[in-house]
């Protein structure tokens, strides 16, 4: 068949080339079909399609059995080489995906490391030879990621688009009010009124958590006095437990310090009233930041591990701490 220069050239499919190589090597349509696990009609159809698409006769049908023509022999040699390289490519890619990464450096905020960290270590044990888990506050961790000292960053900072990096939203948690277990909460109370009964314990504004809480209070209760400030959850909640103050915190932080949290009373913000209306919810979202070219498919595996771990912890939070399940929401986006 004579082709015009304007005709679009469609390369042979892998199946067609596989049938041709099998036919040449076995010497018959029936043997080729047996090797490939398809029908004899399928092999014959592939050969006809090859001849039509290439515009060349591949078999000399004047002989018995038929033999490849010069064009057919050239196609056989090149098709065999292509199929061999494709098979090698598949195996090397699969081997790479199965192989262990030599070192994974994962940075995360303290509350994540203390609660989700153990599940991450177990889940990654079969995927990496060495795991370095670095915890701290968002600004320091972000700097380490920017300097390529971390491969993965779990952060509550809002994503900032940048070349060569990607983000996955993992889960969100809403803040709630932690008060001493025997504290009698006045009906329809505001945070400002409660801070007059017990001092308000603040997280350090060096952390994203402290900045979120301070911004929230500035919008709704700017007159709350700031006397106590903490970098860590443990000392903050220990003082609340001892009836020395109240604080806004999250389920993850409560679980991190559950020794203290089990002796606290936790109230959703929406149960309080500000100027006669329920307080709006305050939440923080955890994101995974990574470099796709470096992490590859492991990124989705890590995200899946986190989501599974959060769902499991959510059941425990509800059972042990008696906090509503809907304060935690897992982001299922891929």
Where would I find each of the regions flagged by the language model?
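A short LG(V/I)-centered, amphipathic sequence patch enriched
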Residues: 51-70
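Short helix-boundary/capping micro-motifs
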Residues: 21-37
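Central regulatory/effector-binding core of bacterial HTH transcription factors
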Residues: 101-161
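Alpha-helical linker/hinge and terminal dimerization helices associated
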Residues: 53-54, 75-97
């Amino acid at each position: 068949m004579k082709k015009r220069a304007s005709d679009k050239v469609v390369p042979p499919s892998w199946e067609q080339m596989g049938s041709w190589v099998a036919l040449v090597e076995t010497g018959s349509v029936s043997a080729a079909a047996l090797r490939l696990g398809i029908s004899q009609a399928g092999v014959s159809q592939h050969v006809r399609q090859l001849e039509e698409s290439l515009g060349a006769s591949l078999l000399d049908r004047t002989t018995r059995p038929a033999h490849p023509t010069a064009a057919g022999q050239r196609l056989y040699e090149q098709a065999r080489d292509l199929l061999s390289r494709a098979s090698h490519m598949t195996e090397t890619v699969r081997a790479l995906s199965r192989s262990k990464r030599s070192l994974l450096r994962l940075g995360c905020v303290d509350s994540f490391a203390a609660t989700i960290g153990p599940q991450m270590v177990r889940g990654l044990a079969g995927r990496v030879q060495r795991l370095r888990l670095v915890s701290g506050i968002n600004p320091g961790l972000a700097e380490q990621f920017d300097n390529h000292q971390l491969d993965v960053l779990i952060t509550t900072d809002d994503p900032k688009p940048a070349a060569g990096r990607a983000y996955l939203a993992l889960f969100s948690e809403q803040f709630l009010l932690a008060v001493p277990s025997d504290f009698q909460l006045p009906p329809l109370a505001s945070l400002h009124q409660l801070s007059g009964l017990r001092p308000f314990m603040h997280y350090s504004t060096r952390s994203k958590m402290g900045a979120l809480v301070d911004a929230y209070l500035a919008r709704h209760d700017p007159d709350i006095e700031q006397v106590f400030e903490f970098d860590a959850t443990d000392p903050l909640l220990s003082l609340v437990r001892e009836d020395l103050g109240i604080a806004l915190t999250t389920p993850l932080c409560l679980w991190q310090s559950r020794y203290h949290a089990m002796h606290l009373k936790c109230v959703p913000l929406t149960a309080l009233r500000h100027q006669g209306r329920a307080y709006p919810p305050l939440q923080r979202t955890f994101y995974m930041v990574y470099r796709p070219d470096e992490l590859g498919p492991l990124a989705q595996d890590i995200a899946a591990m986190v989501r599974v771990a959060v769902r499991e912890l959510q059941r425990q939070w509800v059972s042990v701490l008696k906090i509503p399940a809907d304060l935690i929401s897992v982001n299922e986006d891929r």
